[in-house]
């Protein structure tokens, strides 16, 4: 298979080849840091799920007099789960994209590079959809429970994410459905799609998407405080 490389593809390959060791070291350090962050987020998710399960068990035995109390507690933990799960989706998207970036920055066979390129398209297709959906749930929670909280920056970033997703919908869907997550029934279509993958296009997508999800993480992370306030409204300020 002969890939149709543009002049920019060739230029980027040269630049990457000259700096691949430094790029790889920097990415490895960043990936390790982000993996540690993800582990802390998972603890938060598991904490919420564990307490939701406790509430469910209590509700099975609850009387009509205390059922409302247990439902309120369950609701508070479900709201916290939305926050923590959104942070987890952001972190996982960042880690996955950086993993592919590491491959693209490595001295490996050409077919491995192009396999990573098509994976980038599918990863962005899948994760951007999940993030739009999850941030929608998060916005609904904030508007309902904390209507005075300023979510203007959050809304701006979410709007940018949605626009990015829509602007790149055709190319993301094409690669995902024709040569990666699915395979087109027409072999010529598969070959044509594969041969027209470009390193430059993939890097441009990565740079723009990573910027957006980094900004999204910076506006969602402070909402953990809203989760604490939500729990305090139900349990009081002694609840951890």
State what each model feature region is.
Residues 1-171, 195-240:
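Amphipathic alpha-helical interface segments
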